[in-house]
Amino acid sequence: MKSLKLPPRRAVLPLVRMALREDVGRGDRTAAALAPERGRMRARIVAKARGVVAGLPVAALVFRELDPRVRFHALVRDGATVRPAMPVAEVTGPPRTLLTGERTALNFLQRMSGIATAARALVDRVRGTRARVYDTRKTAPGFRLLDKYAVRAGGAENHRMGLDDAFLVKNNHFTTARAMRLDFAGAVRRARAAARGVPLEVEVR
């Protein structure tokens, strides 16, 4: 599998902070009442099903954003295949922090691992052929960088990151092009002339 590079921290951290604000709000009442603020606790993140892991660095960032004293030790790498009951990470830190960050960290990890697992299943289906599996822009708003990273963790490939990456002429574009008195070939020529050197694709069904 190709080497994986997580999106820049400056792009991921706002998502982590948003997720923590959403979940923690004014504070974790249960953990504040029932978990000590100091001391050390070790927890393990364990796979519940066979699949492909993705998002471990993001999960680590969740805990460290809550408390820099937390130590996150990944036992596998993103892109690894895991089986049920297999430990994937160990987290050590104050009990209250671990309980507060648990759900947010797992939400990132489960979502990204689910995408990676689905991508791997499709890649496996075309293995041995010349076909390649690409993603789309149909991602959760704001989460495109992480969703597309998870696709790569599963062994598939990224298509356009955004509308400015390339031309992708689809049926809707041909519909609007007809209003400009352009046929199929004319629409393609016009798009190509608009920005030479930019990749151009035509969707077929």
Spans of model-derived segments:
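Acidic/glycine-rich phosphate/pyrophosphate-binding loops and surrounding catalytic core
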Residues: 2-205
